[in-house]
UniProtKB/Swiss-Prot annotation:
Protein name: Crustacean hyperglycemic hormones A
GO terms under biological process: circadian rhythm; glucose metabolic process; neuropeptide signaling pathway
Signal peptide start and end residues: 1-26
Disulfide pairings: C68-C104, C84-C100, C87-C113
GO MF terms held by the record: neuropeptide hormone activity
Modification Valine amide, positions: V133
Gene assigned in the entry: CHHA
Modified residues (Pyrrolidone carboxylic acid): Q62
InterPro entries xref list: Crust_neurhormone_CS (IPR018251), Crust_neurohorm (IPR031098), Crust_neurohorm_sf (IPR035957), Hyperglycemic (IPR001166), Hyperglycemic1 (IPR000346)
One GO CC term on file: extracellular region
Subcellular locations according to the entry: Secreted
Family in the record: Belongs to the arthropod CHH/MIH/GIH/VIH hormone family.
Tissues with expression: Produced by the medulla terminalis X-organ in the eyestalks and transported to the sinus gland where they are stored and released.
Length: 135
C-alpha cells in the first residue's frame, strides 16, 4: 500500500506540473509589459524621464497640477492622484507616476492604471473626475 507521504508528494508534483504547462502568467508581469509598451510608444526619446526637462516639471507628491484649468476640488485630485500612486507602487517606476498625471490625468497611462488596478467597474466615476478638473 502506498504511504500517505508518497501520495501527497505525487499530488503536489502533478499540480505543479499542470500549472507550469498551462501557461499561467501573472497579471503584474503581463501588465508590466503592456505599461512599458504604452509608455515607450508615447515618448519619442529613449529616456523615460525626458519629458521632465520641459519648462514645467511635476513632482511625484504634487496633488494639484497648475495646468489643470477645471474646477479645483481637493477630494477629486486626491482620488485621481491615488490611482497614480497605486500604479507607481505596482510598477515601481517613477515615470509611471509622473506620466499618469500628465494632461490633468487625461491620458492613456491613467486609463491603463485604472485597468491594471482593477478599477474598471468604477471607470465612469474617474472619467467624470478627470473631466471636472481638466476642463
Amino acid at each position: 500500500m502506498v504511504s500517505f507521504r508518497t501520495m501527497w508528494s505525487l499530488v503536489v508534483v502533478v499540480v505543479v506540473a499542470s500549472l507550469a504547462s498551462s501557461g499561467v502568467q501573472g497579471r503584474s508581469v503581463e501588465g508590466s509589459s503592456r505599461m512599458e509598451r504604452l509608455l515607450s510608444s508615447g515618448s519619442s526619446s529613449s529616456e523615460p524621464l525626458s519629458f521632465l526637462s520641459q519648462d514645467q516639471s511635476v513632482s511625484k507628491r504634487q496633488v494639484f497640477d497648475q495646468a489643470c484649468k477645471g474646477i479645483y476640488d481637493r477630494a477629486i485630485f486626491k482620488k485621481l492622484d491615488r490611482v497614480c500612486e497605486d500604479c507607481y507602487n505596482l510598477y515601481r517606476k517613477p515615470y509611471v507616476a509622473t506620466t499618469c498625471r500628465q494632461n490633468c490625468y487625461a491620458n492613456s497611462v491613467f486609463r491603463q492604471c485604472l485597468d491594471d488596478l482593477l478599477l474598471i467597474d468604477v471607470l465612469d466615476e474617474y472619467i467624470s473626475g478627470v473631466q471636472t478638473v481638466g476642463k
